[in-house]
């Protein structure tokens, strides 16, 4: 871990340089491939890891090799992972989904912004230097129309987004021919339905049933379609965002690009400092993944941070502002009801959710019901007009393992289930947020409660952290819980960085959190038995046994760290072909010994076989030629 401390000016300059010099970049020995769909503009990006051949025999002068298949893997990096694409952050990404949105002919461009706050910001000349220049003209559903993927799914329509997702979720595994790579252990899916091949129709069915969501605001056409549901690959979210005391627009854009490079399936912008509106615009226009927000944070900024001064009108204006910018999902803390707040009084750590504490304070100061709950149907109407998915927030999640699975937590969860059914009346897509801090033996109940009371809507959890004793290592404590709940059926895991409980994460913290959570998600996919999940593991194991070091580095989730740690002790190029590593050395390497045992066994088999043939030859009289009936 670097101990160099940069000044704020240096941090901003470094981030600006990153943005100015940004190019599409492939991982080592990987190439970007595109798998096409039924129409020419459905081109699904994947990363294909190229592997070296295996030495199978021959001589030093004439070695014989066997080719190893390239391994295709899911890729969230968008254009940033394609060396052939010219990147210009000032212009934003190509509008991949715009033709699909336009072809449906159920939305229209607005003459003006619906949000008074947006109009005010656009009229402020003092913000010109901060503002993204290529602003989109926002769209909204035509009168009487709903533009959500749930609406289309319920009406039997398979959208291009659904076909894109089906191809993406299959991860190119149909390209793999090797039986060694295709081998997979049966999983234990806890009732999840995992088909051998994911079809566009299966995607439609899952969305129509509410078991999966496709976060895809019509005003975020730059995003590449993805799906969140327990019958699909487990997804990972990364949080970024500035605060009142640190970070800048350029640093947040840098973190966005960095997060997608390291596997973030979605990104939440949790900015609470200055220029929230402008920061979000830059992020959206440059994001290939769905963007989520917590609108109450910005609404609070609009009333100078005084929770008691929040109003439905200010919050509604914020929803319109963000929906027309292109936010793909809102976290809404509508389940924090007035009658639940006293339940938290006997907790060790009270209410730890920022959104939950804001709404609890508002309810108590006015002695009124949560205005998000009271106006929930109006929230749904707004979401239906732009296809903003709802992430129903767990404002009463436990902030310590002592408070896990208590009355307040599950009371709110049951209310979120009631709100889910209301949202579905408006064809609004919904996922449910979950904890938090939960010891291992209490995790599964969270999943079963959610499935039962929230009608199988996708679950999205923060960890959970399984112990409270490891500040600085909470990406580990939560990664354990994340792997478990992902196995039990959680659809998306919100990453936790090493800075959790300590400070705002920087670029390196984002990477560490994502790698930890990609491990957790992948472990869950293996345990569930997701088809094709084991291919990369098998390829790695084969490369490891055959001492193909370069392939081991390249197959790793983090090739750079794998290579660096190997080279700390064996930096020479000869170390990349050595049949040992520095852990055991050349004489005690278990895999080298195993290979020798295997070679010896094979030689013994040949020798025994030759002896048997010799004995058989002598038994038949030692004649070179035999009569036909004797053969």
Curated annotation (Swiss-Prot):
Pathway terms, separated by semicolons: Cofactor biosynthesis; thiamine diphosphate biosynthesis
Enzyme Commission no: 4.1.99.17
UniProt entry tagged with the keyword Transmembrane: no
Cofactor note: Binds 1 [4Fe-4S] cluster per subunit. The cluster is coordinated with 3 cysteines and an exchangeable S-adenosyl-L-methionine.
GO cellular component: cytosol
Domain of life, per lineage: Bacteria
Residues that, per the record, bind Zn(2+): 437, 501
Catalysed reactions, semicolon-separated: 5-amino-1-(5-phospho-beta-D-ribosyl)imidazole + S-adenosyl-L-methionine = 4-amino-2-methyl-5-(phosphooxymethyl)pyrimidine + CO + 5'-deoxyadenosine + formate + L-methionine + 3 H(+)
An MF annotation (GO) of this entry: 4 iron, 4 sulfur cluster binding
Cofactor(s) demanded: [4Fe-4S] cluster
Oligomer and partners: Homodimer.
Function field: Catalyzes the synthesis of the hydroxymethylpyrimidine phosphate (HMP-P) moiety of thiamine from aminoimidazole ribotide (AIR) in a radical S-adenosyl-L-methionine (SAM)-dependent reaction.
HAMAP family in the cross-refs: ThiC (MF_00089)
UniProt similarity note: Belongs to the ThiC family.
Protein name (record): Phosphomethylpyrimidine synthase
UniProt organism field: Salmonella schwarzengrund (strain CVM19633)
Source lineage: Bacteria, Pseudomonadati, Pseudomonadota, Gammaproteobacteria, Enterobacterales
